[in-house]
Amino acid sequence: MSYKLEKEAFVSNLTGSSSIETCGLLLIGIACNVLWVNMTARNILPKGNLGFLVEFFIFCLIPLFVIYVSSKVGVFTLCIASFLPSFVLHVISPINWDVLRRKPGCCLTKKNENTFDRRIAGVTFYRSQMMLVTVTCILAVDFTLFPRRYAKVETWGTSLMDLGVGSFMFSSGTVAGRKNDIKKPNAFKNVLWNSFILLILGFARMFLTKSINYQEHVSEYGMHWNFFFTLGFMALGVFFFRRSLKKVSYFNLATFITLLHHCLLVLTPFQKWALSAPRTNILAQNREGIASLPGYIAIYFYGMYTGSVVLADRPLMYTRAESWKRFQRLLFPLCILLVLYLVSNFLSVGVSRRLANTPYVANVAFINMFFLTIYILIDAYLFPSSVPYGSRVPKLLEDANNNGLLVFLIANVLTGVVNLSFDTLHSSNAKGLTIMTMYLFIICYMAHWLAQHGIRFRL
């Protein structure tokens, strides 16, 4: 077997893990968040380059290490261990908020109320940590140090990486939910331009991978399709539904698309075609990408709904009461998503990222909506409302959040470079961890460099 086929086989025919274990892994991100807050509250976090390295250790290396050792130690044991440093700090050291309150711009006055930073730290934590988990996994999966149960499943089941794909869509929708630019005269032109850029990226990736004979997992999206094509066509689909059904809420719209897609899969030969049709024409060659598109559009709308609840009508001071009010508004949608998932299981409809079917959409939307609210509540309950946004968010995470698409692009390019330069399949765990550390450091440094130079790329 050639090395290319060996690498393709390494990520094929996998069955995944459980949603419970995946949530356990995501709790590690919460633990890292709490640790950073505890260090910040006690003014023991270094400044400058050393501070950047400490944040890199907390938010990149701890999750990487947890993923690696989780094949030997239970995930929930690791969760408990991850919260221990914060507990120790809480016991032995007092909190000092005065240093953070004294930072310039932290006090709300009539003079600065129009420019007071209304960004919500919990949203930044959620979006940036989801992005860092995603970019960690896309390279780590090519090393043997990455447990196979966290890699993308072949057809039925779920895993950490399966969640990561949907989470990218949900996270993108979250920040789009606060906007209401559908009525603007140039709205369609903007959507076309954004889609064009994403499709160009998709074609560039396709031609590059074909020209260098790069390994491909065909059953993931198809022979030519890739994630950038999904993003490009999704933007057009979202615009079409928003323009056609203006008065329907984002949540109802997402549920309608999910159920319509489910009926199409179950009541017609569409599911059979998507999973087993001979690849005799351009559509059949890319059947997975086409079949999963409605599901990803639905996930995006669920993200938009969540963003419209969390980010709309923000007060000048985001208090505990405001956070709790947002959480209460999301309780009913969370219950609906949970029911959708449980009913799907009861009817023996398997979770499938390959199809982006109802249980997959419900699972992704529920987990993301739930963890986003947890991040927001943690921020509100651990920080006094008088502490400014700039003191509530690590610079590393803010930089990653501000340039999410560029960070994702850089990660894709670096993943290709590493795979072409190293025999990842036969690398020792020590070598794999070293390469992963350098890879993550370059990504974080590039995000920091882009922020320092005011470069921000948004679609």
UniProtKB/Swiss-Prot annotation:
Pathway: Glycolipid biosynthesis; glycosylphosphatidylinositol-anchor biosynthesis. The chain crosses the membrane at residues 20-40, 50-70, 73-93, 120-140, 156-176, 188-208, 221-241, 250-270, 290-310, 331-351, 364-384, 405-425, 432-452. Pfam families: GWT1. Glycans are attached at residue 13. It is found in: Endoplasmic reticulum membrane. One of its GO terms (biological process) is meiotic cell cycle. Its EC number is 2.3.-.-. It is a multi-pass membrane protein. Keywords: Acyltransferase, Endoplasmic reticulum, Glycoprotein, GPI-anchor biosynthesis, Meiosis, Membrane, Transferase, Transmembrane, Transmembrane helix. Probable acetyltransferase, which acetylates the inositol ring of phosphatidylinositol during biosynthesis of GPI-anchor. Has a role in meiosis. This is GPI-anchored wall transfer protein 1. It comes from Schizosaccharomyces pombe (strain 972 / ATCC 24843) (Fission yeast). The lineage of its organism: Eukaryota, Fungi, Dikarya, Ascomycota, Taphrinomycotina. The gene is gwt1.
